[in-house]
């Protein structure tokens, strides 16, 4: 499956989903973006 990396827009509920090692952060509204897990 495709995934998006650091700083890219994501959506926890419907995708696009973050690559391994990233999580979808929605703090910077209105968009969610992938951030590093570490």
Curated annotation (Swiss-Prot):
Entry GO CC: extracellular region; host cell presynaptic membrane
Main location: secreted
Assigned keywords, A-Z: Amidation, Disulfide bond, Ion channel impairing toxin, Knottin, Neurotoxin, Presynaptic neurotoxin, Secreted, Toxin, Voltage-gated sodium channel impairing toxin
Organism lineage: Eukaryota, Metazoa, Ecdysozoa, Arthropoda, Chelicerata
Recorded GO MF terms: sodium channel regulator activity; toxin activity
InterPro entries recorded: Beta/delta-agatoxin_fam (IPR016328)
SUPFAM superfamilies assigned to the protein according to its UniProt record, in alphabetical order: omega toxin-like
Entry protein name: Mu-agatoxin-Aa1c
Modified residues (Serine amide): 38
The protein's role, per its UniProt record: Insecticidal neurotoxin that induces an irreversible spastic paralysis when injected into insects. Modifies presynaptic voltage-gated sodium channels (Nav), causing them to open at the normal resting potential of the nerve. This leads to spontaneous release of neurotransmitter and repetitive action potentials in motor neurons.
Pfam family, one: Toxin_7
Domain commentary: The presence of a 'disulfide through disulfide knot' structurally defines this protein as a knottin.
Tissues expressed in: Expressed by the venom gland.
Source taxon at top rank: Eukaryota
Cysteines paired by S-S bonds: 3-19, 10-24, 18-34, 26-32
Cellular location(s): Secreted
Family that this chain belongs to: Belongs to the neurotoxin 07 (Beta/delta-agtx) family. 02 (aga-3) subfamily.
Coiled coil: none
């Amino acid at each position: 499956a495709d995934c998006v990396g650091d700083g890219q827009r994501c959506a926890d509920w419907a995708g696009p989903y973050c690559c391994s090692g990233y999580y979808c952060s929605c703090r910077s509204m209105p968009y969610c973006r992938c951030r590093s897990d570490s």
